[in-house]
Amino acid sequence: MREEKFYSVRMRASKNGSHEVGGKHLSGGERLTTYENMIHTVNALLEKGIYHSRGKPDFMKIQFECIDEPIQLVNPLHIETHEVESAEKGQVLARKLLEKAGIQKKMIDLAYEQIPECSGLRGAILFDIHSGKRIDQRKERGVRVSRMDWPDTNFDKWTKCYQMPRNSRIKEALVLATKVSEHPATIAELCWSDDPDYITGYVASKKLGYQRITKLKEYGNESGCRIFFVDGLRDLETYIDYLEKQPVFIQWEEENDA
């Protein structure tokens, strides 16, 4: 795997112009691929951006670059699904899971006050569990996790073992959550999609694994959330550099789950 050249491919799509001029963010995507599979990968991201429930884009950017750094191999987080009756009960459970991950209740309350800021962000908010403040200084951009993927053949093995659907949403979310949780500065992540037709979200951490919650908002709601609860005492610049630039492949091995 490491002898073969890989490329980071990124897509972002928006409506009413590009993100830089205030366009509405619709969709984004991240893949790692070989040069031979470039056309297939680009076409998949193109299709994702064009056929999106948030609307039809009038701006899209797809770019790729060669990866020169060694690719880190990471085992996926253990996954657990919680069936809940309503978004309200889902949010109560999410707060409990964040506490279980080691975050004080008052800090969780402060983080939830930041959620309106998440709407329309291309990336995540970094929330310091010590100060109770947002510390990424990225305003409407947020921090976008990049350079990550899960090879299809290995993902298929994982879905069969856990009897999970071969679902691109689950794959993309688990890839991102695993990369984020792998860094020691990450305490936990809280996320739900801005897609109006997708209401499932999750709480993830190295300690808890990937805790999938079936309802965290109502259908038709385009407000999403992605908050990384971080130890602000660690080097923030190094942490953001890892999130944005460190290439990571998810590689599941059955014996690692034993």
Swiss-Prot record:
One MF term in the entry's GO annotations: 6-carboxyhexanoate-CoA ligase activity
Any single biological process term in GO: biotin biosynthetic process
Catalytic EC class: ligase
InterPro entries the UniProt entry points to: BioW
Keyword Membrane: no
Reaction catalysed by this enzyme: heptanedioate + ATP + CoA = 6-carboxyhexanoyl-CoA + AMP + diphosphate
Keywords: ATP-binding, Biotin biosynthesis, Ligase, Magnesium, Nucleotide-binding
Cofactor needs: Mg(2+)
EC number: 6.2.1.14
Pathway where this protein functions: Metabolic intermediate metabolism; pimeloyl-CoA biosynthesis; pimeloyl-CoA from pimelate: step 1/1
Binding partners and assembly: Homodimer.
Function: Catalyzes the transformation of pimelate into pimeloyl-CoA with concomitant hydrolysis of ATP to AMP.
Family per similarity comment: Belongs to the BioW family.
NCBIfam families tied to this protein: bioW, PRK01322.1
Name listed for the protein in its UniProt record: 6-carboxyhexanoate--CoA ligase
Organismal lineage: Bacteria, Bacillati, Bacillota, Bacilli, Bacillales
